[in-house]
Design a protein with these regions (language model features):
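N-terminal beta-alpha lobe that positions the nucleotide/phosphoryl donor
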Residues: 1-186
Length: 186
């Protein structure tokens, strides 16, 4: 079990992590931007450290600032919460390189699961049930139409690289599939 963790996030998720850590008797370090200095998560944590200006790209997404904060406060692990750096394999790797545990999936798992086509293939290989769909990348609208005819409508059309729900379209009927495919492919 960790003695101290740094929460690389803000707001409600940071508050929840702090409360859970407190129940486990784990000390917490909150990070904050200059805009969030008096935010609730900074007040609830055992320690709080500024990681940069209000702009998220210069604070909550600044890997070097967050790792420096963890080293300075002697945190043993970093909990990313969700969003920000939570799915950043480079961040997870850098945590490992400086001897700080990343609380979440490994960088390798993030890389595998970040590509939807590869993720689906890995799930099938591991015998995890998956919903009917393509067996790989769909290159043309005609190929998408053939797959949709086989499995039936409605279908969900997903851009393989889209994350967080981006690039996903529900298609109710064949006549809408071509335009949805073109949108997802652009």
């Amino acid at each position: 079990m960790f003695r101290k963790i740094l929460i690389a996030n803000r707001g409600e998720i940071a508050v929840r992590i702090i409360r859970a850590a407190r129940e486990l008797v784990i000390a917490t370090v909150a990070v904050y931007s200059t805009a969030d200095k008096e935010a609730l998560h900074t007040l609830l944590a055992d320690e709080a450290i500024c990681i940069g200006p209000g702009k998220a790209t210069e604070s909550y997404l600044n890997i070097n600032a967050i790792l420096s904060a963890a080293v300075l406060t002697e945190a043993e692990a970093i909990h990313p919460g969700f969003g920000f750096l939570s799915e950043n394999s480079k961040f997870a790797t850098m945590c490992e390189e400086v001897g700080i545990k990343f609380i979440g999936p490994s960088a390798r798992v993030m890389d595998v699961m970040g590509d939807k086509i590869n993720a689906r293939a890995q799930m099938i290989k591991a015998k995890v049930p998956v919903i009917p769909g393509s067996d790989g990348e769909v290159h043309t609208a005609e190929e998408a139409l053939a797959i949709a005819e086989k499995i039936g409508y409605p279908v969900m059309l997903k851009a393989s690289a889209g994350g967080g729900g981006k690039g996903i379209r529900k298609v109710e009927k064949a006549e809408d599939l071509v335009s949805a495919f073109e949108t997802a492919s652009s």
